[in-house]
């Protein structure tokens, strides 16, 4: 814990760092409070600021759109600022992801080179700022997006930023990714060390074209393959507006009788008989 106090104003910022040596992961966040007589408005409040000294930096980010999820792109970070942000609120990760990779001296690679992976524990509007200064050093600033996010902080109230979780590797992004996986299983996921059920989703097999008999056969095949769970995807609903394509049916949440005359209960029975 590092405590910072302003010399002129009754404002304090506490920097928190938790290290997980076994997983080689660090979790960090900030707390802000003040003792002014009236509330103070916070306009910017980063989770942390990381500062690197090197010769070359390469950023890998992930953009998305419908049916084009996680499009990876890499670019060098040169003098000035590069910002990744979103203002979509609850759909924050629709077009860009709150996750990035950094490569030092070369683009991040799977099995070699120095790499850093980072993500923010925040599902709303976020902002990552990467700034290379006049002497070639790099600042990384992960934060809640300050756009329309001013916060009125009352005296002696504590404002806590989202956590920023990151890891380093000298052996590429593969090792760094496994670090984060291990950390998530050990400290973040409920029952992270437990067994996970395998799942068969019918979408890539049937798309919108299925009926009760076909789904029942898929469930039997799922059990034969050792799969534990069957997931019925799109196309099961709509009578007035049948969901036979992706341009109809949304909002008509009745089970489609032409495809599933027995309704969901018939599928449940088929699943029980198949043992999934």
Predicted regions, residues:
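A short, polar/charged loop/turn motif at coil->beta-strand junctions and beta-hairpin connectors
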Residues: 112, 134, 192-194
């Amino acid at each position: 814990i590092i405590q910072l106090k302003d010399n002129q104003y009754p404002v304090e910022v506490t920097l928190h760092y938790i290290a997980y040596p076994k997983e080689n992961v660090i979790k960090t966040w900030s707390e802000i409070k003040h003792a002014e007589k009236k509330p103070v408005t916070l306009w910017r409040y980063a989770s942390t600021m990381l500062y690197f000294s090197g010769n070359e930096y390469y950023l890998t980010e992930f953009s998305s759109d419908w049916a084009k999820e996680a499009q990876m792109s890499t670019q060098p970070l040169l003098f000035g600022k590069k910002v990744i942000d979103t203002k979509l609120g609850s759909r924050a990760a629709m077009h860009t992801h709150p996750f990035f990779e950094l490569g030092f001296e070369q683009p991040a690679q799977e099995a070699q080179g120095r790499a850093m992976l980072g993500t923010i524990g925040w599902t709303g509007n976020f902002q990552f700022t990467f700034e290379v200064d006049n002497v070639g050093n790099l600042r990384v600033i992960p934060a809640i997006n300050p756009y329309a996010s001013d916060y009125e902080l009352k005296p002696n109230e504590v404002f806590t930023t989202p956590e920023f979780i990151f890891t380093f590797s000298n052996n590429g992004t593969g090792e760094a990714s496994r670090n984060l996986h291990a950390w998530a299983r050990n400290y973040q996921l409920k029952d992270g060390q437990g067994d996970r059920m395998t799942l068969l989703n019918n979408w890539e097999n049937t798309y919108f074209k299925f009926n009760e008999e076909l789904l029942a056969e898929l469930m039997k095949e799922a059990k034969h393959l050792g799969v534990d769970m069957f997931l019925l995807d799109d196309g099961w609903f709509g009578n007035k507006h049948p969901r036979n394509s992706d341009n109809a049916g949304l909002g008509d949440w009745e089970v489609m009788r032409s495809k599933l005359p027995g309704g969901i209960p018939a599928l449940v029975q088929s699943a029980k008989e198949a043992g999934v």
